[in-house]
């Protein structure tokens, strides 16, 4: 067995070494003379071909399509069954800071409870009506008192607790429904509001009336980020509990979003520019242009205002669902954005221009005249701390990794492999073949090496792609990597099978030998109080009988009780 394990171990080591090898790995670069004497003593410096992005982890929360996965301006990204009907409900995974609902030509706040009983339709808002159990609005202090026996809820931050509270209530008419109410959290007053209505926009003379005097007509409303909503956060049932780590909140000062292109963060070339007097206005503009799940068409039957009025007065969900609990986007277009839209912007504080774009940013450019913002971000809060050491730290990590690989595989140690990072606040670490250029607007004192040929470029759709002349190298490397991975998987699978077969053979042989070993235990035979199945020794004599004739074939016998 030890030999088998040694063989398997050596095979695994061989496969690991094969997996680590680079497809275009060059032989040792030691140069010899005619007499085989080493001429080069200085280590050779070369540039790695691997294109890694030091911003990858930092920028994960700004991948809004992945982190939020639903509309922002209007969030109706999920369907829920209630009874026999399908409703659209908010489903975003991140809070939308500063978002509220404006009821046009009305002084009523959307956080006012919906109209019930004899109230006029326009006297109410969107919030949950009064109930026997006071569940909304409710302060965070009272929420923590309410759930003090639940340690898991007590660990949640205020926004997560508000969302969880609102999502804990089910429809009376269908307790098995996945329908859950959205919520709004007031950070100034520390109050949690449950929203009775999931709809966020209803516009157009065909569907609503802006006439403030007509109190019983359907009111018009739309989402907005204005100054009165700065302290609010709109929450769906899907907001993650650790949203601080996974979602953007503060805008990024001294920064603008960019695209990582083979060693440097470059500006996004294709953008929409809009004049904006300040950051708040730019944030509001990007919110208006952001991902939206709002349907573009509605069913013609949405003109029966009397039915909707009665629905509110009688608290009849079936009557009001056409307007406020949208049934499959009003049975016309069930559009879901999945978070795709103009969700990002760079605000130029000097020229007062807001640059919008719909491509996921992959890095940050350090620029003292810019602020990077998103449609999810707070309208005013700014974090001015730029991670100045990110490039230097990544270069040191990459070089330590290369050094370990060289030591492990006995690669020529007279070789230094530099990572493909051409920007840093440590000019000497760039090892640039030309004089590095100093970035004037940088608050981090960055230098960039512009004389190394880039292997990637930005296309017209703001996507980064490898240049044609280098594609074959990376395709070959990817193919080799897949082949090596396949070899490793095959090797591991084969090794497991060999170990299993060897183990089975070993234990079967051991069990077989144990049976024969009992033939040497003649002294124990014939004891009247013992009942065992044993192999009969040819010299044994049971119960006064003569010896057995067979001296070659052991026989399994059972001793009777006396």
Swiss-Prot record:
One term under GO cellular component: membrane
Primary role: Involved in parasite invasion of erythrocytes.
Residue ranges, Extracellular side: 22-484
Primary localization class, coarse: membrane
The protein's name: Apical membrane antigen 1
Similarity remark: Belongs to the apicomplexan parasites AMA1 family.
InterPro entries: Apmem_Ag1, Apmem_Ag1_dom_sf
Signal peptide: 1-21
Gene designation per UniProt: AMA-1
Protein keywords: Disulfide bond, Glycoprotein, Malaria, Membrane, Signal, Transmembrane, Transmembrane helix
Disordered, as annotated region: 519-543
Recorded coiled-coil stretches: none
Segments on the Cytoplasmic face: 508-562
Keyword rRNA processing: no
Membrane topology according to the record: Single-pass type I membrane protein
Cysteines joined through disulfide linkages: 94-247, 162-192, 208-220, 265-363, 282-354, 388-444, 432-449, 434-451
Subcellular localization, as worded in the UniProt entry: Membrane
Lineage per the UniProt record: Eukaryota, Sar, Alveolata, Apicomplexa, Aconoidasida
Sugar attachment sites: 84, 176, 226, 405, 441
Pfam families: AMA-1 (PF02430)
Organism of provenance: Plasmodium fragile
TM annotation in the entry: 485-507
